Regions:
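Solvent-exposed loop/turn segments connecting transmembrane beta-strands
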Residues: 9, 166-170, 209-210, 238-249
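Outer-membrane beta-barrel transmembrane domain signature
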Residues: 195-216
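C-terminal outer-membrane beta-barrel translocator/porin domains of Gram-negative envelope proteins
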Residues: 44-195, 199-201, 240, 253-256
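Short, solvent-exposed loop/turn segments at secondary-structure boundaries
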Residues: 2-5, 48, 203-206, 242-246
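Conserved active-site loop/cleft motifs that coordinate metal ions or position small ligands
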Residues: 190-192, 227-235
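Transmembrane beta-barrel wall of Gram-negative outer-membrane proteins
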Residues: 1-66
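Outer-membrane beta-barrel "beta-signal"
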Residues: 217-223, 247-259
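Extended, charge-rich C-terminal regions with high alpha-helical propensity
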Residues: 1-4, 219-220, 225-227, 237-239
């Protein structure tokens, strides 16, 4: 065959949720939340659908979040439980239908813990801010790829291009960011260092590795007059498994507009 083969995918997501503040005082608040999720994924080679990769899943989620204020610092913590269902025409995962030795199921049972810290402080006449974000995912059953924890992108362990990740049914990561308030209003320069690990089976094969570490530097801020927020950054891997291919330096940016 001469020519390029085009691999593409389409996804649809619907998430309906409710939340209620069940406790509030001067030092913090506690929120109970619930949601129902429906997701459909279809993949194609050229214009022909790969039917064994079609997914239609649904799940319910119940979570509890707490925010607490200590001086200038804000501490967040949360826990949630997600359970896969057969609601709304959800289909069994193809891993459930084929005897490949990997008993992953779309009827997932996922427990997720989160924690965060936002601490503004001053050194001399300079203003700084330290941020920490932590997430741990645990599961009693092997998970299909959409439900696995994947590390190695701008949302988990920064410094990687995101073209390849480490994915498995359980794991954790922590992001650490130190930001300096520049003389320009609402503009921050920041440095970050992240680390993450995954465990369990990722599919029918053995994981390439179990941990990643990366660093990042960037500039972010708001342009209030235009309703714009931006984040421009560059990052690099600090530690990765042998054979894990990624760019030695990664650049990226994001822009959002509110009106």
């Amino acid at each position: 065959y001469n020519g390029d083969i085009r691999y593409s995918g389409k996804s649809k997501n619907l998430n309906v949720g409710l939340s209620r503040v069940i406790q509030r005082n001067a030092s913090g608040k506690t929120t109970l939340r619930s949601s129902v999720q429906v997701r459909e994924i279809r993949n194609y080679i050229d214009r022909t659908e790969i039917e064994v990769q079609r997914r239609r899943t649904s799940a319910w989620l119940l979570g509890l979040d707490h925010r607490h204020y200590i001086g200038n610092a804000t501490i967040d913590g949360g826990v949630s439980y997600q359970r896969g269902t057969r609601w709304f025409g959800a289909m069994p995962a193809y891993e459930e239908q084929y005897e490949d030795g990997y008993d992953a199921t779309a009827k997932s049972k996922i427990l997720t813990w989160t924690a965060g810290l936002n601490w503004p402080f001053a050194l001399g006449n300079q203003n700084f801010r330290y941020q920490m974000n932590y997430l741990r995912q645990m599961s009693t059953t092997p998970l299909t790829s959409p439900d696995q924890l994947a590390i190695g992108n701008r949302w988990t362990v920064r410094g990687f291009d995101g073209e390849r990740t480490l994915s498995a049914s359980h794991g954790w990561y922590v992001q650490n960011t130190l930001a300096w308030q520049t003389p320009l209003p609402e503009q921050e320069f920041y440095l970050g260092a992240d680390y993450g690990e995954v465990g369990g089976r990722s599919d029918g094969s053995t994981l390439l590795g179990r941990h990643l570490a990366g660093g990042v530097a960037g500039l972010r801020g708001n342009i209030s007059a235009l309703g714009l927020s931006y984040d421009a950054f560059g990052g690099t891997p600090l530690s990765k498994p042998h054979g894990f291919k990624t760019d030695s330096v990664t650049f990226g940016f994001s822009v959002s507009w509110q009106y």
